[in-house]
């Protein structure tokens, strides 16, 4: 439900991989569109050093350049470090109206923001979906007032129904990939019912049929199947 790496689209999965969240091939374009709308003229980019980070960074870089936005530098960062002042120094030396942080809010991405604020290098952050969460707001508060980002979501009829069901169950439906997780679980159950089996081969055989039947959907990704 939260696997968005573009590389997974062409994965040799033997028919066993499905996802209810859109690929970062689209997410990166949307984030670039928002960057343009916010009048950013130049941006430095840092990404978590894995397939998710590299894939999204590549798409975002190409998309912002297509909008005429200057990319001053693109660097990877490793998660789990205690200090990110070196990475921020590299980003700062390249300059930019903002720094795009493609990573995780509880890992290196948060460290990049902290080091940027501590040094005064940047005060505007472009945030990938993995950086969106209440804990980031709790950590930095008003220091994020110039920042922006994007994450997959839905405003369709199914999303409204899910929000009511989730609220009744004490679940915050606005959380990242909550709706997509529900979709994924529901599709697995429906595929099991359709094949009258919990065998993985049977589930894989039936999951697209039940998805395309539009029996249940809450997310944009699932909407597109119908």
In which residue ranges do the predicted regions lie?
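Extracytosolic ligand-binding ectodomains
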Residues: 1-219, 226
